[in-house]
Amino acid sequence: MELKGSEILVQCLREQGVDTVFGYPGGCILNVYDALYKHSDEITHILTSHEQGASHAADGYARATGKVGVCMATSGPGATNLVTGIATAYMDSVPIIAITCNVAVSLLGRDSFQEIDIAGVTMPITKHNFIVKDVNKLADTVRRAFKIAKEGRPGPVLIDITKDVTANKAEYERKEPEQVKRITDRIKAEDIETAVKMIEASKKPYVFVGGGAIASGADAQLNEFVHKIDSPVADTLMGKGAFNGTDPLYTGMLGMHGTKASNYGVSQCDLLVVVGARFSDRVYGNAKKFAANAKILQFDVDPAEINKNIKTDASVIGDVKVILEKLNEKLPQMNHNEWITEVKSYEEAHPMTYHKGVLTGPYIIEKIYEATHGDAIISTEVGQHQMWAAQYYKYKAPRQLLTSGGLGTMGYGLGAAIGAKMARKDKLVFNIAGDGCFRMNMNEIATATRYNIPVIEVVVNNHVLGMVRQWQDLFYGQRYSQTVLNDRVDFAKVAEGLGAKGYTVSTCEEFDNAVKEAIELNIPVVIDAQIDKDDKVFPMVAPGAPISECFGEEDVAEKFGR
């Protein structure tokens, strides 16, 4: 049948199983919005307060489900407002489709109103992007974009469609979405055999898990693998939940704000098995001294990650779920009780601790964990609160923690929470923010109230830019340049002005009551939780130092002379 391009686009979204789109209309994309209006029973459109919020919401939807998230915006500033969200998704390998509409073909290259080369702008931050100037190519382009976004290492894809394409007609025939194939052709039998021999020879193995294990859906295979080789487990920020955080073999996050146990264990192990982790500089500290006693065995779907930052001794390239399945078939049951006892003894001697009896970041996270029975979806912004959320909430399953790990995007979390809640209405969704981050995109509270999306925003409010100030305190002679927020914005009143319920709390009891009420209300809520400006995130590794030199608050006086 013959349809307009805008109708073809919407039909292709339906083909791919898209049920929710986040966006903001404008001149060049009007035809698409007209088509969406006609199909509002099949595809829900969430009008965000800003296009950046739409891109983060699509990201949160994707991370919470493993499906492709979709956002859209008009040409010019609408398109450029998506850029930060696209870059966030790119750095964390999140499958989103960003749909933009540009000026008509006849107006391209003429500095037309709201014309921008958004494909050129986003080329370095997309897995692929397309410019569609022919309506006859639109349907296949959309189908290909979804396949690219999902296949192999996931990532964002941009489709820029000229306005005349959305108005022109072409033949459309519905097609079933192409099944995404797991990348297995690079998994070599000899590489599997090498991995088996290295694991069997190890006396002190350590498993290090990243976001690739979640993207692959490898949590069950990972659990079997870990217990079969009887190894302690550390993870990255992006790998939280791939391995159950309540399992006795789990020792916590690795790296700059990782646990002392994980940083110690990886520094002492003789084999580091890396499952879908990309070796961010925040993980390894001093590259020359990282896991100095160990051979490194890396599993990853992307060959570009092998030897990129840390030299490996052996690797297996391919889908990590399939790799682990093959290894589980070949490996015997192993016993490393003596090694595990050593690591656990160190963990018991260096536990995660914080000041009790006063409202602090760690207390806030532990209370949310308790109130949600460890079953909520937690999104975060970026900073101290992000690290506390990683350290003190025990993630039992994949896709529970949504956070900007690679780009470190302040303003990410609220949009992501909205996207996650739209995707997982059965889950409680909390966004953990700092007061600096909340200012970035707090207008999205209006989105939550417009659609009654019951996300709970917890602002860990220390009236400073906490993480930057922590560095200034420890490494910049306590010169607090532009990190003190003296304006004292009343976030509870801001919330109420945007239609949400607002709380201001400063004690543990007040916070406990606010969280309990927020869960019971089942409406958008903002809790302004006021803590001391000098609270810091520990443990910590100084910039450029090896992770074995991880220090806690108890070490500050000796290390810094105060």
Where are these regions (language model features)?
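N-terminal alpha/beta PP-like core and its mobile active-site loop of ThDP/TPP-dependent enzymes
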Residues: 1-331, 367, 371-374, 454-457, ...
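Active-site diphosphate/adenylate-binding microenvironment
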Residues: 6-10, 14-19, 32-37, 344-420
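Generic hydrophobic/aromatic pocket-lining and core-packing "Φ" positions
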Residues: 10, 86, 142, 416-417, ...
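Active-site nucleophile and cofactor-binding loops and adjacent substrate-binding regions
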Residues: 24-26, 45-56, 71-78, 133-134, ...
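Thiamine diphosphate
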Residues: 114, 450-543
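Hydrophobic, well-ordered secondary-structure elements that form the walls
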Residues: 296, 368, 380, 419, ...
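Catalytic phosphate/nucleotide-handling subdomain of diverse soluble enzymes
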Residues: 412, 416-454, 460
